[in-house]
Design a protein with these regions (language model features):
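Surface-exposed, interaction-prone regions used to assemble/regulate multi-protein complexes
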Residues: 1-147
């Protein structure tokens, strides 16, 4: 079952926000950034099951023109003696956009935490050993519920 939400209309859509789901795959092509989310059968509070009971997974496709930015939360490493004197420096760094697909294949599981929607803009919050923000220009979003 497919649902389409347009982000370039006069009013923003009311769309479900899946949260705390594991991303099994990410694909990037010329038009779409696609996240494939899977349900956790052990989790009684699964957000995909909450929005569509009986769904096994969800495919989210953001229609974009490869115009996106990726930021990852990092902490600088300092020698132990300096850490006692100074707090570690925490900041966000740019991640190469070609590494977006590799994030799902990392040894740490990649979680889809939430997303924020604005006019023609989406900010996706991911998590894999640290916070990752994906900011992109998108004119519509497709949800495909897998049963």
């Amino acid at each position: 079952m497919k649902e389409t939400y347009y982000l370039n209309k006069d009013t923003l859509p009311v769309m479900p926000v899946p949260h705390d789901n594991i991303i099994s795959n990410i694909t990037v092509d010329d038009e779409f950034v696609t996240f494939i989310l899977e349900t956790d059968p052990k989790d009684k509070d699964d957000s995909i099951q909450y929005y569509k009971p009986g769904a096994k997974g969800l495919i989210i496709r953001y229609h974009t023109e490869r115009d996106y930015l990726i930021y990852q939360h990092r902490k600088t490493r300092r020698p132990r003696i300096l850490c006692k004197l100074f707090r570690p420096r925490i900041h966000y760094v740019d991640v190469d956009e070609n590494k977006l697909e590799a994030l799902a294949r990392d040894k740490y599981s990649l979680d889809y935490i939430e997303h924020f929607v604005g006019y023609n803009t989406v900010i996706v919050n991911l998590y894999a050993k640290s916070s990752i923000y994906l900011r992109m220009q998108a004119d519509y979003v497709e949800y495909e519920w897998l049963f």
